[in-house]
Amino acid sequence: MSFNSHRRMLLDESQPFSHRASHARSCALLVSRKVGLTRDAIIELVQSKTSVDLHAPQSAGELLIALEELENMRLTR
């Protein structure tokens, strides 16, 4: 699936939170492939910039914050 497909699923509030979090990590994987880093490195960068741990997000709001950072990384690198 593409970044945008995972993004849509992450934003779908009818999906269980755990599935939405999984789609956020899939977005991180696709960003990592684009910029040449590992998925874990991207997740660490997101956490350092936003304080959101994508391995254990606490709320839908955190997922949105992380998504915004992932989109910025995707477009600026």
Protein language model regions, located:
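Alpha-helical propensity feature that highlights long, continuous alpha-helices across diverse contexts
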Residues: 1-77
